[in-house]
Swiss-Prot record:
The chain crosses the membrane at residues 378-398. Interacts with XBP1 isoform 2; the interaction occurs in a ER stress-dependent manner. Interacts with LACC1. It is a single-pass type II membrane protein. Keywords: Activator, DNA-binding, Endoplasmic reticulum, Glycoprotein, Golgi apparatus, Isopeptide bond, Membrane, Nucleus, Signal-anchor, Transcription, Transcription regulation, Transmembrane, Transmembrane helix, Ubl conjugation, Unfolded protein response. This is Cyclic AMP-dependent transcription factor ATF-6 alpha. It comes from the Eukaryota. The keyword Amino-acid biosynthesis does not apply. One of its GO terms (cellular component) is nucleus. The lineage of its organism: Eukaryota, Metazoa, Chordata, Craniata, Vertebrata. There is a cross-link at K75 (Glycyl lysine isopeptide (Lys-Gly) (interchain with G-Cter in SUMO2)). The basic domain functions as a nuclear localization signal.
Length: 656
């Protein structure tokens, strides 16, 4: 049975080790016993600190007493060996005085053991196929000087009583790294004795290996006087061996004794039993195994630490996942609530939209009718009514052909001017519509109203001033012409004309009726002259020139005009024209002299130009005479001064 204290090591003996072992044993045989007695004291003092406490089974003290025959000599009794009986190999503690670091065994051992197969000295023994006879030991002869105080020195020869003794060749194994020792101190001797057992010989023998504890250190060797004896008690169990150590009270700390049995093998030649050589194992190999165990333990510690860290990381990861899951669940619940509220609001909005989409035909129809009525009243019907009223309004009736005094009225002049303005506006409207007809649009829309022409901003005060200037210019020409033609009239006519001038001074415009008299009336000297009005003499001329009421006309039948063209032209504005005509001096006190000519300059913008064909019959008679005279003298000498005074004439407004 294998011991639990040491691992099983294979048995591999070598011849060099055997020769070395026998050389050492011969040295111990030739050495005198005096060396043991001389060095006994030194070894006795050196082993006081050793500790040989071993946890072994108790034994009987009387068997190990000094008076017993076991203490006098070391011998093996011829007893049957049990399978549990074995030889014990005790590793002695290290001493600084030892000569070598090897372990020694006795040269001759007579052992009674069963035949075993030498498969392994440290393994379980096998049953022998043949029976082994019991062996008997002879008691060795002891000398008188070999006994010491504390123990007996072993004899070198053990004899068998009935059969020749078996002398095995012990093996010498190298121990741990050698230590430097003193050569004068002899080596220690270890005596190993097998223990008899009560078991029969036919049973197996077990090897008990006591391995030292895994402590780093070298093997402790015992000196020569120290004797380790292993004796068997009277009754021992086959399971555990008994180890007895004598020779000193020193203790062996942190060391375990290896007990190695010596298996007996039967020799096929002579039929005797041969004891195999026991092997004393040192602690060298245990150091390698200790290193391997230490590395294994370190790997286990590292593996456990890494496993712990991985479990910790996994736990932290799981905790993080749980926290994220909780946050996601809470956020999901919140989003579900918000989604529900938004869905409810959307349903409310959709329902409200459906209610608002319900058509209301009455309201819509009323709104459309109101808009149409507003458009018709503001644009269409009002303009149509105005045009109809303009068309229906009668024109100014011509004066009856009868005799009447030369007079004029401001009210009549105002009515006449208003009528002319309305007529001109009506004609302007029609002209605009005709111009629009010439464009791409073939038909005018029903409610289309032509926009008024784009006019620049006009200062009202400036417009009134210009109008007053032009009307005064025309009026003064008419007054001067009337004075020159009626120098021969009576005082009554002069008073009437004076009253008319005073009455017209209140208004800005004063029109003078033009009366055409015959040569008979001119030559007559009566106070009352017949006035023959000819209203149709100018109407044809007005139609020919398309007269408008809001425009001043300057008509000349002379050919001797001075025309000056413009030197520059701006494309963004209308062409400008300035008309310079003779004028009547307003106040003779301002300019009094014959060195200056009074002229009127009229600045205007050209709106339109066209060629007119006027019948000669429509031209007034007095203008025809001037036309003939000016035509004949166009390329001749200029007219006289008397003729130039009558060139510019005015048309009375009563005939317009």
């Amino acid at each position: 049975m294998e011991s639990p204290f040491s691992p099983v090591l294979p048995h591999g003996p070598d011849e060099d080790w055997e020769s070395t072992l026998f050389a050492e044993l011969g040295y111990f045989t030739d050495t005198d016993d005096v060396h043991f007695d001389a060095a006994h004291e030194a070894y006795e003092n050196n082993f006081d600190h050793l500790n040989f406490d071993l946890d072994l089974m108790p034994w009987e003290s009387d068997l190990w007493s000094p008076g017993s025959h076991f203490c006098s000599d070391m011998k093996a009794e011829p007893q049957p060996l049990s399978p549990a009986s074995s030889s014990c190999s005790i590793s002695s503690p290290r001493s600084t005085d030892s000569c070598s670091s090897t372990q020694h065994v006795p040269e001759e051992l007579d052992l009674l053991s069963s035949s075993q197969s030498p498969l392994s000295l440290y393994g379980d023994s096998c049953n022998s196929p043949s029976s082994v006879e019991p062996l008997k030991e002879e008691k060795p002869v002891t000398g008188p000087g070999n006994k010491t105080e504390h123990g007996l020195t072993p004899k070198k020869k053990i004899q068998m009583s009935s059969k020749p003794s078996v002398q095995p060749k012990p093996l010498l194994l190298p121990a741990a790294p050698k230590t430097q020792t003193n050569a004068s101190v002899p080596a220690k001797a270890i005596i190993i004795q097998t223990l008899p057992a009560l078991m029969p010989l036919a049973k197996q023998q077990s090897i008990i290996s006591i391995q030292p504890a895994p402590t780093k250190g070298q093997t402790v060797l015992l000196s020569q006087p120290t004797v380790v004896q292993l004796q068997s008690p009277a009754v021992l169990s086959s399971a555990q061996p008994v180890l007895a150590v004598t020779g000193g009270a020193a203790q062996l700390p942190n060391h375990v004794v290896n007990v190695l049995p010596a298996p007996v093998v039967s020799s096929p030649v002579n039929g005797k039993l041969s004891v195999t050589k026991p092997v004393l194992q040192s602690a060298t190999r245990s150091m390698g195994s200790d290193i391997a165990v230490l590395r294994r333990q370190q790997r286990m510690i590292k593996n456990r630490e890494s496993a712990c860290q991985s479990r910790k990381k996994k736990k932290e990861y799981m905790l993080g996942l749980e926290a994220r899951l909780k946050a996601a669940l809470s956020e999901n619940e919140q989003l579900k609530k918000e989604n529900g509220s938004l869905k409810r609001q959307l349903d409310e909005v959709v329902s409200e939209n459906q209610r608002l989409k319900v058509p209301s035909p009455k309201r819509r129809a009323v709104c459309v009718m109101i808009v149409l009525a507003f458009i018709m009243l503001n644009y269409g019907p009002m303009s149509m009514l105005e045009q109809e009223s303009r068309r229906v309004k009668p024109s100014v009736s011509p004066a009856n052909q009868r005799r009447h005094l030369l007079e004029f009225s401001a009210k009549e002049v105002k009515d006449t001017s208003d009528g002319d303005n309305q007529k001109d506006s009506y004609s302007y409207d029609h002209s605009v519509s005709n111009d629009k007809a010439l464009m791409v649009l073939s038909e005018e829309p029903l409610l289309y109203m032509p926009p008024p022409p784009c006019q620049p901003l006009i200062n009202t005060t400036e417009s009134l001033r210009l109008n007053h200037e032009l009307r005064g210019w025309v009026h003064r020409h008419e007054v001067e012409r009337t004075k020159s033609r009626r120098m021969t009239n009576s005082q009554q006519k002069a008073r009437i004309l004076q009253g008319a001038l005073e009455q017209g001074s209140n208004s800005q415009l004063m029109a003078v009726q033009y009366t055409e008299t015959t040569s008979i009336s001119r030559n007559s000297g009566s106070e009352l002259q017949v006035y023959y009005a000819s209203p149709g003499s100018y109407q044809g001329f007005f139609d020919a020139i398309r007269r408008r009421g809001d425009t001043f006309y300057v008509v000349s039948f002379r050919r001797d005009h001075l025309l000056l063209p413009a030197t520059t032209h701006n494309k963004t504005t209308r062409p400008k024209m300035s008309i310079v005509l003779p004028a009547i001096n307003i106040n003779d006190n301002v300019i009094n002299g014959q060195d200056y000519e009074v002229m009127m300059q009229i600045d205007c913008q050209v709106m339109d130009t066209r060629i007119l064909h006027i019948k000669s019959s429509s031209v007034p008679p007095y203008l025809r005479d001037h036309q003939r005279n000016q035509t004949s003298t166009f390329f001749g000498s200029p007219p006289t001064t008397t003729e130039t005074t009558h060139v510019v004439s005015t048309i009375p407004e009563s005939l317009q």
